[in-house]
């Protein structure tokens, strides 16, 4: 990490590594501190999926509910796209530029999305993108009666203790049209608490933020039976299997997610490692493009795994398949 900061002239970076209840690294490099806020890009998706799962836990939403149940502007076949498909990039909803337009509201943008032709038949393809998460964010608004930002704050950020994490911060300053897939910013400490909560199967500091079943749903393969290899994001990450808002970097031979992650375009790379009983984050804001920044952070994560193995950190003996570049 230190070499990356120097060679790429980055402001800083950070590394968090926890395994078997031991914190092996919580180190900042360059000008970064544990409270430095950076954009986390698509690692936002993990947060949005978790926010939706709180509604599932309360019985207000089912993952198999059609989007039209909450947003009647979605008509025809696309109205049958389910909440599960919104969170797994299999809904068929076409990408829309309005998700980036600050002068719109999330409601206005999603109405525009609903009027578009589907990109493909619902459930027939994995197409990684951002727009379906805006639709999911709007569902959250309708069900809770709150803005997406407020719903995230009350349901995830506050109980987890993510005091510096926002979807409408300095890097994307709009509360009216946040991008649930990509506009969050966070700190190492904040997101570290989130992955700790996911690792603990929904619990943190005695608070059950998510049920264990919801965490399991997020880590379960949602694209089984689909050929994902042609997708650009799969080609970048080398990971062909996806859950709900999270990639499945390592799976067992019976398809249980062992290591899941939520990598972002600027190289921010958080993970939960059930094989070594831990979690971690490569904390970096690397603007060289996702095709460079993400694989480099992924390699650093793999180096962490190798270092833990060299230290003799116990690992599950279950046969696994590891994906990545």
Q: How would you describe each model-predicted region?
A:
Residues 227, 289-325:
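Short, gly/Ser/Thr-rich active-site loops of penicillin-recognizing serine hydrolases
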Residues 164-182, 188, 220-281:
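Active-site Gly/Thr loop motif
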């Amino acid at each position: 990490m230190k070499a990356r900061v120097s060679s790429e002239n980055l402001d800083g970076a950070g590394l968090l590594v926890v395994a078997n209840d031991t914190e092996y690294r919580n180190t900042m490099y360059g000008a970064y501190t544990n409270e430095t806020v950076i954009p986390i890009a698509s690692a936002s998706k993990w947060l949005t999926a978790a926010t939706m799962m709180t509604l599932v836990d309360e019985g207000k939403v089912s993952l198999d509910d059609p989007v039209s149940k909450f947003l009647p502007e979605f008509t025809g076949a696309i109205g049958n796209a389910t909440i599960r498909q919104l969170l797994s990039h299999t809904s068929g909803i076409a990408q829309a530029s309005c998700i980036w337009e600050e002068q719109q509201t999330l409601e206005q943008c999603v109405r525009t999305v609903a009027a578009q032709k589907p990109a493909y038949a619902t459930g027939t393809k994995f197409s990684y993108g951002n727009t379906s998460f805006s639709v999911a964010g709007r569902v959250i608004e309708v069900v809770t009666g709150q803005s997406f930002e407020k719903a995230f704050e009350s349901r995830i950020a506050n109980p987890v203790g993510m005091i510096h994490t926002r979807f409408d911060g300095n890097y994307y300053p709009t509360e009216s049209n946040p991008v649930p897939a990509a506009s969050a910013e966070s700190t190492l400490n904040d997101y570290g608490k989130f992955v700790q909560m996911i690792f603990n199967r929904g619990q943190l500091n005695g608070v059950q933020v998510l049920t264990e079943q919801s965490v399991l749903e997020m880590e379960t393969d949602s694209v089984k039976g689909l050929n994902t290899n042609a997708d650009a994001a799969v080609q970048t990450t080398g990971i062909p299997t996806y859950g709900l808002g999270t990639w499945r970097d390592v799976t067992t031979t019976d398809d249980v997610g062992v290591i899941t992650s939520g990598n972002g375009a600027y190289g921010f790379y958080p993970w939960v490692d059930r094989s070594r009983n831990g979690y971690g984050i490569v904390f970096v804001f690397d603007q060289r493009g996702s095709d460079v920044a993400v694989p480099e952070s992924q390699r650093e994560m793999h180096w962490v795994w190798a270092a833990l193995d060299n230290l003799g950190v116990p690992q599950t003996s279950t046969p696994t398949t590891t994906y990545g570049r």
